[in-house]
């Protein structure tokens, strides 16, 4: 079989599958709506999270550990601690605030007369350490313990409750997204499978005659796979339209909720690359469901034979 002939077979299968859908507009529309509803919720949640990055960014800020050197620590001691912290791969960022810088900031915020009454500079050198964003609360505690054991470090402070709360929020969002994506993806496959199965049953005699005439399984399966492809494309388009409508509907309500707190939602729709991924993923799910349905029917035919 030449490449041109093989290509023409696929083009003809795609055209016949599209015509088959257009012959039953009402049934096709119901199927598209059913498939679109199955994917609208995870897509809309993704849009909501991406649009709300300005708000979620405040929750995603990594917790920090403030390290206080001893007041008697020399510059060489601070340099040693800085070197040790820099070599620690668990840390994402290290900021040093020298005692002189701290005193200057204190002078700008307090009365000069009060500062002049101080006997020397009572402030220590300070390091503000930001661990890697993926650090768990248990790992944060380990980092905290290791830092307090460094030479000439007097103490360190960390908001352990905020670390735990932040981790739980991020884990909750991540698990909800995975759960919705998995369950609704499975629902989409099952709906596509059932839709193609009904199409196969409606053409059962035609398929069995074709099989008896010696047609290969790929020839029988091909039009149904393309039918699933067209259904996936159209249902994805309907779902994206629903997402756009939902976005415009909830936008004023959400803005009204966050406006008193000075929080602005950066609303957006899918980028071109994201649209390509959505269509590709949905087509893959639909074709997989159709493949399962056709394979099941062909196996049943072999068993009867």
From Swiss-Prot:
KW Transmembrane helix (keyword) present: yes
Bilayer-spanning residue ranges: 29-49, 176-196, 230-250, 269-289
Location (main, coarse): membrane
GO terms, biological process: cell division; FtsZ-dependent cytokinesis
Location relative to the cell: Cell inner membrane
Keyword terms, alphabetized: Cell cycle, Cell division, Cell inner membrane, Cell membrane, Membrane, Transmembrane, Transmembrane helix
Domain of life from the UniProt record: Bacteria
Record-linked InterPro entries: ABC3_permease_C, FtsX, FtsX_ECD, FtsX_proteobact
Phenotype reported upon loss of the gene: Viable. Exhibits morphological abnormalities indicative of defective division sites. While division in wild-type cells occurs along sequential, alternating division planes, the mutant is characterized by the presence of multiple and atypically arranged division sites which frequently divide the cytoplasm into small cellular compartments. In wild-type cells, the replication and segregation of DNA precedes the ingrowth of a septum resulting in two equally sized daughter cells, the process of which is not seen in mutant cells.
Residue spans, topological domain Cytoplasmic: 1-28, 197-229, 290-305
Coiled-coil region: none
Listed GO CC annotations: cell division site; Gram-negative-bacterium-type cell wall; plasma membrane
Periplasmic side stretches: 50-175, 251-268
Membrane topology summary: Multi-pass membrane protein
Family: Belongs to the ABC-4 integral membrane protein family. FtsX subfamily.
Subunit structure: Forms a membrane-associated complex with FtsE.
Role description: Part of the ABC transporter FtsEX involved in cellular division.
Listed name of the protein: Cell division protein FtsX
Record organism: Neisseria gonorrhoeae
Classification of source organism: Bacteria, Pseudomonadati, Pseudomonadota, Betaproteobacteria, Neisseriales
């Amino acid at each position: 079989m030449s490449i041109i002939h093989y290509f023409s077979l696929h083009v003809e299968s795609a055209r016949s599958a599209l015509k088959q859908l257009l012959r039953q507009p009402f049934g096709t529309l119901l199927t598209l709506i059913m498939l679109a509803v199955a994917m609208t919720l995870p897509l809309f949640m993704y849009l909501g999270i991406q649009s709300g990055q300005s708000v979620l960014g405040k929750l995603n800020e990594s917790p920090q550990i403030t390290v206080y050197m001893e007041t008697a620590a020399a510059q060489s001691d601070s340099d040693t601690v800085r070197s040790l912290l820099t070599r620690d791969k668990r840390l994402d960022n290290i900021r040093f605030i020298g005692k002189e810088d701290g005193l200057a900031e204190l002078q700008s915020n307090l009365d000069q007369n009060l500062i002049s009454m101080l006997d020397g500079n009572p402030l220590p050198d300070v390091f503000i350490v930001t661990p890697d964003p993926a650090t768990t609360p248990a790992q944060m505690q380990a980092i905290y313990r290791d830092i307090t054991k460094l030479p000439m470090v007097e103490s360190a402070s960390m908001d352990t409750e905020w670390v735990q709360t932040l981790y739980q929020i991020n884990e909750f969002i991540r698990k909800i997204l995975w759960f919705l994506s998995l369950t609704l993806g499975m629902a989409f496959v099952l709906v596509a499978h059932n839709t193609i199965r009904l199409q196969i049953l409606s053409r059962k005699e035609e398929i069995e005659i074709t099989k008896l005439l010696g047609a290969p399984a790929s020839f029988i399966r091909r039009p149904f796979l393309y039918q699933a492809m067209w259904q996936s494309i159209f249902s994805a388009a309907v779902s994206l339209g629903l997402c756009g409508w939902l976005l415009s509907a909830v936008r004023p309500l959400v803005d009204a909720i966050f406006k008193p707190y000075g929080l602005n939602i950066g609303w957006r729709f899918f980028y071109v690359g994201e649209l390509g991924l959505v269509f590709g993923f949905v087509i893959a799910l639909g074709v997989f469901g159709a493949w399962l349905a056709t394979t099941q029917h062909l196996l049943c035919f072999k068993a009867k034979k």
